[in-house]
Amino acid sequence: GGKNPALPFGKIVVALLRAIKGERYRSDLVKKLSFMGYNSRFDKSEGENAWLTRAGELVADRDSDERTNFTFTLAGYNDLFTMLGECNGSQWYSQYPKNLPTILIAGTDDPVGNFGEGVREVYDGLSKAGVISLDIDMYEGARHELFNETNRAEVFRNMCDWLLGVCG
């Protein structure tokens, strides 16, 4: 959530590498640039994907499983960066359906959401755009994958309660 000032640079790097290597190439450089710093607040002993969750066994599984610990293709990074640019652009907020009930959920230790700041930025943008039914739930200490967090039962319960409240 929120704007990422490095996004234009990332798109340029991906475009250059795609021109040289092709869109199906898997670049360790782009992976490193994309995720560098995500683990910086966490103890190295927690694993290379500690930024995803506090659940150590899930991090260990993620770190050791090639099906979940892989490098996107350059086409995948291009699509991801394009989507991030569109979803964080000023026009996105004005185009968002005003009557769509929306909840933003995030962990306060999620580096992707800038430790809560990016999610609040998105919330503020949607609020200023006039979204009528808008909620935010921040989970103290939780990281990126809330449904794989140590408090996942609480997250699921809160999401079910919110959905029941909206859908009645």
Language-model features, listed with the residues they occupy:
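Short beta-strand/loop motif that positions the catalytic acidic residue
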Residues: 104-106
